[in-house]
Regions:
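Generic low-complexity, intrinsically disordered sequence content enriched
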Residues: 8, 18-21, 125
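Nuclease-adjacent, charged terminal/linker segments that flank catalytic cores
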Residues: 1-11, 23, 46
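Acidic-basic catalytic patches of nuclease active cores, encompassing PD-(D/E)XK
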Residues: 15-56
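Glycine- and acidic
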Residues: 10-15, 86-87
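Active-site metal-binding core of divalent-cation-utilizing nuclease and nuclease-like domains
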Residues: 46-78
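Acidic metal-coordinating catalytic centers involved in nucleic-acid phosphodiester chemistry
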Residues: 2, 6, 66-69, 75-155
Length: 155
């Protein structure tokens, strides 16, 4: 089973994730990804078109890097893919400054994987996000979007 770490501590129970704020929603998604290998595989396949071994995936929640912000989620298997997810509540998309900071984070830059992506998650449809996200690619890293509706469909 994948490992879920929040604030440096392993999350072992869904009850650690109760709440309805933006961060609570993100924690719940992270927990579901870590505990449901088929859901994790479906999400990775959706955004990267990759078949993965869920056993080898690490999911990090609220990962801090000095001068580069705090990511909502970072998901990697350290061999084929590295994803940074920025989740928003409502019809909101991450801005250019936030995406630029994430594209410069040490972990994604130094990762030897061949598939990297920054993913926006919100209630915005994919069509809306494709029209209004500030970048399609930043620092050679593709920027994509998954709506909460699509996440629900994948689950």
């Amino acid at each position: 089973m994948s490992e879920l770490v929040a604030y440096g501590t392993e999350v072992s129970s869904v009850f650690q994730l109760i709440g309805n704020l933006e961060n609570d929603i993100t924690k719940s998604i992270a927990w579901a990804l870590a505990r449901c290998p088929e859901f994790l595989k479906a999400v990775i396949n959706e955004v990267m078109s990759l078949e993965i071994d869920a056993q080898n995936v690490r999911i990090k929640y609220q990962e801090f890097e000095k001068n580069k912000g705090i990511t909502d989620l970072e998901i990697t298997d350290d061999t084929s893919f590295y994803i940074i997810i920025e989740a928003k509540r409502g019809w909101i998309l991450p801005g250019a400054e936030q995406l630029a900071l994430y594209s410069q984070r040490r972990n994604i830059i130094e990762s030897p994987v061949s598939h990297k992506s920054i993913i926006s998650m919100s209630e915005c449809s994919e069509d809306y996000a494709n029209a209004y996200l500030p970048f399609k690619v930043i620092n050679d890293i593709p920027v994509n979007h998954l709506s909460w509706k699509r996440i629900y469909e994948l689950a």
